[in-house]
């Protein structure tokens, strides 16, 4: 099994990916480092596939990973509801490839390659 360690322990890495997945679902576009974005891509694709399945078990699997944050303050919609009601129906006819990674250039402080990852 191949994955990036991202300079963190196992639990820290899982927490980072949970936060990034939740942010990407809520904002649909985030700026991060290239290594994080490439690792995030596979997790987000799996979450959207769960959303497309749409049954109770898929909803519970996604809820176990995605943080319980409010996505829309006016409607009170959280990240899971947005994933299943807004994002998943958008990709019903698409088999994978739900994200796009666009390179930005190096970060000013340490020169890390920065990218924008967004939902297509």
Curated annotation (Swiss-Prot):
Keyword Ribonucleoprotein appears in the UniProt entry: yes
An example Gene Ontology CC term for this record: cytosolic large ribosomal subunit
Biological process terms in GO annotation: translation
Coiled coil: none
MF (Gene Ontology): structural constituent of ribosome
Keywords: Ribonucleoprotein, Ribosomal protein
HAMAP family referenced in this protein's UniProt entry, alphabetically: Ribosomal_bL17
Subunit structure: Part of the 50S ribosomal subunit. Contacts protein L32.
Family named by the database record: Belongs to the bacterial ribosomal protein bL17 family.
Listed name of the protein: Large ribosomal subunit protein bL17
Organism, scientific name: Anoxybacillus flavithermus (strain DSM 21510 / WK1)
Organismal lineage: Bacteria, Bacillati, Bacillota, Bacilli, Bacillales
């Amino acid at each position: 099994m191949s994955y990036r360690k991202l300079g963190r322990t196992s639990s820290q890495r899982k927490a980072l990916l949970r936060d990034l997945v939740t942010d990407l679902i809520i904002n649909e576009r985030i700026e991060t480092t290239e290594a994080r974005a490439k690792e995030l891509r596979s997790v987000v694709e799996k979450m959207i596939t769960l959303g497309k399945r749409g049954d109770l078990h898929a909803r519970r699997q996604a809820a176990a990973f995605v943080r319980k944050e409010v996505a829309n303050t006016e409607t009170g919609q959280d990240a899971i509801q947005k994933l299943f009601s807004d994002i998943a129906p958008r990709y019903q006819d698409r088999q994978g490839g739900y994200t796009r990674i666009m390179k930005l250039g190096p970060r000013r402080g340490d020169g890390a390659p920065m990218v924008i990852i967004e939902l297509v």
